Design a protein with these regions (language model features):
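Alpha-helical transmembrane segments of multi-pass membrane proteins predominantly involved
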Residues: 1-502
Length: 502
């Protein structure tokens, strides 16, 4: 093994770990000297600087062609999504948690950096054991971050997240063990080779089912989503942003790699009139459950955070629609949409955090009169929610159109005939989602307060970091809506280079 080359590939992760250790050291030194914890602002900017430096380090890491057997992968897909994770992580760091609830900001932001390290490592591997270890590094950090607020609700969120996460980790590890037992290979390319030698055994099928269950938890796919509403409502906004944006993007990359590299030969078909056993049918069932449950349950929510949690479940369903088609173009569309979804949800959380600070809660009525007290926040919220709803000309519309059109194309011309039923259900559920997204916008733009009276909330100025967390995603969604090829073409090329050529 060439350790110098390996170290160079791990340079972004090394930068994050070193920054986290420096931050912890500075926090200890400050507390020892002044008997006070390091300030939130100082910890935030140290962490943000580390993420930026990791991005600079990633820029200098070359793409390699040995992703089929290497422990660490730096193919075009890994490089692209490591950059995406760092960008989403930087925006999440910019979201300030409630200061009265975070007693140790040094530890809080260090855990964020450790979580990002785990997500980067997960993005860049095809090795089964290393995949599990990296994913759990990120997960353990997120469990702690979910309970960092000194509130009962945050503690409940952390406990549920940990318990459900522990069960999903057990499923994932057991599934990976069974797949290794079937293939006698520790890499996805080795699994694909074993699968090509004959029909999949019961070990392989059972292992894949358990892996899908484990990854379904990470993606908040129904029926593995029960942790999501409590975590979205109780955890600090920064943690929720990481879970909703960066963690979901990485989970989708892992699922795409697993299905398109390791088990592409066992896809089967989810056709309405010609079902063939395989993971395509599983993806279709999970997609239908996620879309229906996510959208229906979102209609009854009185907390915007919980509404966004069920929105996450529904959007996972849209992503799985594309994977049901098991084509390269559909995989590219899913990866494009998961980025767009992450930006829109992160931005919506940033505005929600500002409303919570000003009004004391995240009820839809707290958004009443937002256009009068904070006009640019209201405009940004309009961009985020209409993008999630799939209204043109924003990036969310382009993403959903790409998802549904590629699934239909595969349905008509590709290897998955008869997916029209699933695309039709997705279109209906997307239309239903308009109601709960627009109900928030109605409060923000039409009503002056909970009872039609002027809002009692007063908008305080946003910090520079918080303003960036609101403004950057909004501008990006508009630009990607007008010029989607800026991101869609690189993703499509990365999918072709990284998955098809294995």
């Amino acid at each position: 093994m060439n350790y110098s080359a390996l170290l160079k590939q791990l340079l972004p992760e090394a930068v994050l770990v070193i920054t986290a250790l420096v931050l912890l050291g500075v926090a200890v030194a400050v507390e020892a000297k002044s008997r006070k914890a390091i300030s939130h602002r100082a910890a935030l900017w140290i962490a943000a600087s580390g993420v930026v430096l990791a991005g600079v380090a990633l820029w200098g890491v070359p793409v390699t062609g040995d992703g089929g057997t290497a422990l660490i992968v730096m193919d075009p897909l890994a490089r692209l999504f490591k950059a995406v994770v760092l960008a989403l992580g930087l925006l999440a760091v910019m979201l300030p948690p409630a200061r009265r609830e975070i007693a140790q900001p040094g530890e809080f932001y260090a855990l964020i950096l450790f979580a990002l390290t785990g997500l980067l490592l997960t993005t860049g591997t095809n090795h089964l054991l290393f995949l599990f270890v990296a994913l759990e590094l990120a997960s353990l950090s997120l469990y702690l971050l979910a309970g960092f607020s000194r509130t009962a609700r945050s503690g409940e969120a952390s406990l549920k997240y940990f318990l459900f996460g522990g069960v999903s980790a057990a499923f994932l590890l057991f599934g990976l063990s069974l797949i290794y037992g079937f293939s006698h290979a520790a890499t996805l390319t080795g699994v694909a080779t074993a699968l090509g030698a004959g029909p999949p055994s019961s070990l392989a099928v059972t292992g894949l089912v358990m892996v899908v269950v484990g990854l379904g938890f990470k993606l908040a796919a129904a029926p593995f989503h029960y942790w999501a509403p409590d975590v979205y409502q109780g955890a600090p906004a920064t943690t929720v942003a990481l879970v909703a944006a960066a963690s979901k993007a990485v989970g989708m990359v892992v699922l795409v790699r697993f299905l398109m590299i390791g088990f592409h030969g066992a896809a089967g078909s989810a056709a309405w009139g010609g079902v063939i056993a395989g993971w395509s049918l599983w993806m279709a069932v999970l997609a239908a459950l996620s879309m229906v449950l996510g959208n229906v349950l979102a209609l009854a929510q009185t907390s915007v955070r919980r509404l966004l949690a069920y929105s996450a479940v529904a959007n996972t369903g849209y992503l799985l629609v594309a994977l049901s088609a098991h084509g390269e173009s559909a995989a590219g569309a899913a990866l494009f949409y998961v980025i767009v979804y992450g930006l829109a949800t992160l931005g919506a959380l940033a505005v929600t955090a500002a409303v919570e600070r000003d009004c004391g809660d995240d009820a839809p009525t707290s958004f009443a009169g937002l256009v009068h007290r904070a006009p640019w926040q209201a405009v940004a919220l309009l961009i985020f929610l209409t993008s999630l709803a799939g209204i043109p000309p924003l990036a969310g519309f382009v993403g959903k159109f790409a998802l549904f059109s590629t699934a239909m194309a595969e349905s008509t011309h590709g290897g998955s005939p008869g997916l029209t039923w699933l695309v039709g259900l997705a279109a209906i559920m997307s239309a239903i989602s308009l109601y709960y997204y627009l109900s928030i916008l109605k409060q923000a733009f039409v009503r002056g307060g909970p009872d039609g009276e002027p809002s009692a909330c007063e908008a305080a100025p946003l910090s520079i970091a918080h303003a960036l967390a609101v403004g950057v995603p909004a501008v990006t969604l508009v630009v990607l809506g007008l010029f989607p090829a800026l991101l869609l073409d690189p993703i499509t090329a990365a999918v072709m280079d990284s998955l098809v050529m294995r």
